[in-house]
């Protein structure tokens, strides 16, 4: 089948890039032709929607007594070629992608199926146009399969949608041939708001094995010592810094990182003045960080996922701002909920507590077969 994938934009997010790489790889191995329909940095908007967006931006800025930033996407676009050059190269070399997709101009005749997912495609705050994630552009298409694979709401509660938006999404969801979600909490959300049954499946990255990721990253060698702690932290704060210092001191580990010094190119002047320190390292380096590390400390969902894939002992500090439902759903599958720690309980945790990987890997294989069956049953 000729399949188009709708997911979050493929820019710098390592987990977002690799979940799409994994889903494409899996679908290709199942015999399909696959392309990811990537969104542009500057969104395709009608004049009316653009004016509405500008008005809302102004109102929010006045309410918060801030100078409004009208064109954040244009700021990112200006520096895009530099700060995303490594991640963009990985995408171009490893993912079949249509860049700057204007979804309204896609043709029905070019596709046999559309797959939405994975990642937080149904989390409104991360979607420029939530209708795209429910295939509104294809609502009148015929002879097309509409599938959601491991779609995520990001949280376990319904939020950030007005009643009319919910009705709009429900009408579009009714057209889907099959739905699956990445978190168990998504099953209830689909039933409550869309009146649709959804299956709980694995994040696409877990459909591949460590060897698959080593195959695309082994050409990059990291000179990391034997006793190392890979610190993949998205939201650095005093708590995460204190936790890293505590873990390294107690276990005698050397911390290392795979993130730029500056990550906010829009509002941070220093980031724009120091582009080398704002550039995201290669995806291959990120993968090799897991392969090389003795232990992983993270507040990232996919940081947790890849720790499991590479069978590395790990500790997760809860990231409530980004959504704890994802972590709880993932770790409950494997009985690893005790790997989530809070700053308050860190001092009382035995950081040398091992993980028995044999049952974890057996569970992952069972879920992998279940998830693959969802794809094979619904894409034929």
Predicted features, each with a name:
Residues 1, 110, 139-143, 214-228:
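Nucleotide-sugar donor-binding and catalytic loop/hinge architecture
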Residues 5-14, 18-171:
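Aromatic- and Gly/Pro-rich donor/ligand-binding loops
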Residues 147-154, 187-190, 240-280, 342-348:
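Catalytic donor nucleotide-activated moiety binding site of glycosyltransferases and closely related
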Residues 157-161, 206-220:
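Acidic anion/phosphate-binding donor-loop and adjacent secondary structure
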Residues 276, 332-380:
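Leloir-type glycosyltransferase catalytic cores
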């Amino acid at each position: 089948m000729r399949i188009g994938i709708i997911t979050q934009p493929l820019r710098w997010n390592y987990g977002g890039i690799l979940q799409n790489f994994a889903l494409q790889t899996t679908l290709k191995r199942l015999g399909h032709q696959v392309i990811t329909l990537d969104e542009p940095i500057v969104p395709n908007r009608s004049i009316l929607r653009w004016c509405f967006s500008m008005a809302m931006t102004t109102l929010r800025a006045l309410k918060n007594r801030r100078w409004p930033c009208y064109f954040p996407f244009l700021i990112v676009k200006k520096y895009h070629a530099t700060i995303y050059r490594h991640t963009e190269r990985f995408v171009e070399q490893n993912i079949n992608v249509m860049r700057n997709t204007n979804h309204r101009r896609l043709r029905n005749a070019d596709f046999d199926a559309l797959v939405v997912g994975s990642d937080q495609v149904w989390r409104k705050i991360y979607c420029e146009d939530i209708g795209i994630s429910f295939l509104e552009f294809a609502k009148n298409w015929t002879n097309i399969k509409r599938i959601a694979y491991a779609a995520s709401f990001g949280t376990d509660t319904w939020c950030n949608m007005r009643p009319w938006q919910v009705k709009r999404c429900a009408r579009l969801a009714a057209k889907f041939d099959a739905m699956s979600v990445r978190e168990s909490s998504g099953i209830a959300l689909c039933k409550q708001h869309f009146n649709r049954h959804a299956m709980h499946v694995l994040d696409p990255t877990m459909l591949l094995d460590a060897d698959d990721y080593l195959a695309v990253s082994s050409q990059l060698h990291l000179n990391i010592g034997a006793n190392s702690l890979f610190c993949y932290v998205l939201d650095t704060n005093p708590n995460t810094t204190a936790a890293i210092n505590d873990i390294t001191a107690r276990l005698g580990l050397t911390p290392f990182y795979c993130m730029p010094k500056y990550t906010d190119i829009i509002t941070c002047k220093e980031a724009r003045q120091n582009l080398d320190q704002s550039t995201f390292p290669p995806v291959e380096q990120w993968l090799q960080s897991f392969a090389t590390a003795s232990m992983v400390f993270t507040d990232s969902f996919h940081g947790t996922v890849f720790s499991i894939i590479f069978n590395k002992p790990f500790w997760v500090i809860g990231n409530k701002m980004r959504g704890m439902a994802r972590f709880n759903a993932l770790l409950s599958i494997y009985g690893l909920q005790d790997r989530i720690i809070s700053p308050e309980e860190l001092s009382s945790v035995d950081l040398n507590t091992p993980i028995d990987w044999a049952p974890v890997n057996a569970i992952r294989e069972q879920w992998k077969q279940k998830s693959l069956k969802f794809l094979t049953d619904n894409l034929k």
